[in-house]
A protein has these predicted regions:
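Active-site HxH/HxHxD metal-binding segment of metal-dependent hydrolases
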Residues: 30-31, 44, 51-126, 145-146, ...
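Residue-level signal for inorganic ion chemistry
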Residues: 38, 48, 85, 152, ...
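Active-site metal-binding loops of divalent metal-dependent hydrolases
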Residues: 49-51, 74, 98, 130-131, ...
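Core dinuclear metal-dependent hydrolase active-site scaffold
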Residues: 37-39, 112-143, 179
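Accessory terminal helices/loops
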Residues: 2-11, 175-185, 194-305
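A short acidic, helix-capping loop that chelates divalent metal ions and anchors anionic groups
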Residues: 103, 157-163, 196
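Conserved beta-strand hairpin/beta-sheet module of binuclear metal-dependent hydrolase folds
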Residues: 14-64, 137-151
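Active-site-adjacent loop/tail segments of enzyme domains
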Residues: 158-184
Length: 305
């Protein structure tokens, strides 16, 4: 059984009645979902309630009032708890899709808003790809570091499958994410980290940062602890999709060992390799086109493997 995990907003020395103390809680649900719960001493705010029971149990156990529900997209494993939790909600049920039933307020990107009964500011980010209307919620000052609630748009060492969005949209969403501060915490909705790291190491088995993180995640998971939240800085080092997208934003020499590993893996499952021939890496548009091609190949490979 996976246990809850908490990330705190304040050390004991800087907590006071002038600055509410917030915590970020990962509530396990279903086989691999996390329901993210923000709490202070009196209220709770919940992201993507895939089930009602874990939320109800937590707020009852801790004597909290359920303030808001924040929804990233319409898939059942992100919304199934809405109907049952709605009578408990004292604030709003927020999302940005007509396909999400039970919303009380639609907030369109790039809206900035404040969580009900709090001083926590959040931004709605348009993050399509996994679905065409997927959004994420960015809280720049929730904890001592920013927090990104990104649903299925980004996972630790991976990203969501492209369903009714497009590959270009998914690419641009990751491009948006990796330009956030490196210390930004990634609160994604699924515990896929081990399988994603295995995939990353099939591309480049000798990558030290990825191997080191795999060892850390195995240690945590063997003890029933979540591998999340991750961070933008970590994902830029270990996530194949972030590494591909980063090529389009960088002027550094290409990591040819990683690209060769990706192409070798592609050829092993009869997918065409991405050619570096005639790519002028000094030209920004050429680098971005290469980055998109590598990102697309990563996604097609992950779908197969």
């Amino acid at each position: 059984m996976t246990h809850q995990t908490a990330v705190s907003s304040a050390s004991p020395t800087n907590r006071s009645h002038h600055k509410p103390h917030y915590e970020l809680i990962a509530l396990p649900a279903r086989s691999d979902n996390y329901i993210w719960l923000i709490r202070n001493q009196t209220h709770a705010w919940v992201v993507d309630p895939s089930l009602a029971e874990p939320v109800r149990d937590y707020i009852a156990q801790h004597g909290l009032t359920l303030a808001d529900l924040l929804i990233t997209h319409h898939h059942y494993d992100h919304v199934e708890g809405i109907v049952e939790l709605a009578p408990w909600v004292q604030g709003r049920i927020i999302g940005d899709s007509e396909r999400i039933h039970g919303l009380t307020e639609r907030l369109h990107a790039p809206t900035e808003f404040t969580l009900s009964f709090s001083d926590v500011h959040a931004q709605v980010l348009s993050t399509p790809g996994h679905t065409y209307d997927h959004v994420s919620y960015y809280c720049p000052h929730l904890l001592q570091t920013p927090v990104l609630f990104c649903g299925d748009a980004l996972f630790s060492a991976g990203c969501g499958r492209v369903f009714d969005g497009t590959m270009a949209q998914a690419f641009e969403t990751i491009e948006q994410f990796i330009q956030l501060p490196d210390e930004t915490l990634i609160a994604c909705a699924h515990e896929y980290t081990l399988s994603n790291l295995d995939f990353a190491l099939r591309i480049q088995s000798a990558h030290e940062a990825t191997q080191a993180h795999l060892n850390q995640v195995k240690y945590a998971r063997e003890r029933g602890l979540p591998s999340l939240p991750s961070s933008i800085g970590l994902e830029k080092r270990i996530n194949p999709f972030c590494r591909a997208v980063s090529i389009g934003l960088s002027t550094e020499p290409l990591d040819t060992a990683w690209i060769e590993g990706l192409n070798h893996l592609a050829q092993s499952v009869q997918l065409p390799a991405v050619s570096l021939a005639n790519v002028d890496t000094r030209e920004p548009n050429a680098r971005k086109a290469l980055a998109l091609a590598l990102f697309t190949l990563c996604r097609e490979l992950k779908n197969r493997i």
